[in-house]
């Protein structure tokens, strides 16, 4: 009796494994199509600006898999590299310089910004008070 139960369990394990492999293959095919279509390519580069008390380092991945997926699908990604624990005015001044540096490096006219938490405040300040509004195509803030 036990061998029959084992065979039944093995059957369900194999059935589940085959379904998972098929699903993974389908997902990879979709990812390949997305990559070849470059669905995340934008006219302007994207600047990711983190929130307070974080740094853009390779030791801690603040943004998770978002930058990787955006780049894999055609986007050009940059990071703020600013001191987020500084005042909004000081952080905004750093971000202004970073934006001008990126525009110079890429030759782009403008930049798209995705900012989290205090990074959004820093960017809004830079846009409204430091005169770079004409260099920013979009600002998306997330909480």
Roles of regions detected by a PLM:
Residues 1-64:
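Flexible, membrane-associating and regulatory peripheral segments of lipid-active enzymes
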């Amino acid at each position: 009796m036990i061998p029959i139960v084992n065979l039944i369990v093995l059957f369900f394990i194999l059935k589940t494994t085959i379904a998972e492999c098929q699903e993974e293959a389908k997902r990879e095919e979709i990812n390949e199509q997305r990559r070849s279509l470059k669905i995340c390519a934008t006219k302007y580069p994207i600047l990711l600006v983190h929130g307070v008390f974080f740094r853009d380092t390779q030791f801690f991945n603040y943004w998770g898999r978002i930058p990787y997926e955006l780049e894999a699908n055609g986007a050009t990604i940059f990071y703020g590299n600013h001191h987020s624990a500084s005042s909004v005015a000081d952080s905004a001044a750093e971000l202004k310089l970073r934006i001008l540096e990126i525009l110079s490096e890429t030759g782009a006219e403008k930049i798209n910004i995705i900012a989290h938490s205090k990074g959004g405040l820093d960017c809004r300040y830079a846009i409204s008070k430091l005169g770079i509004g004409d260099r920013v195509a979009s600002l998306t803030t997330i909480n």
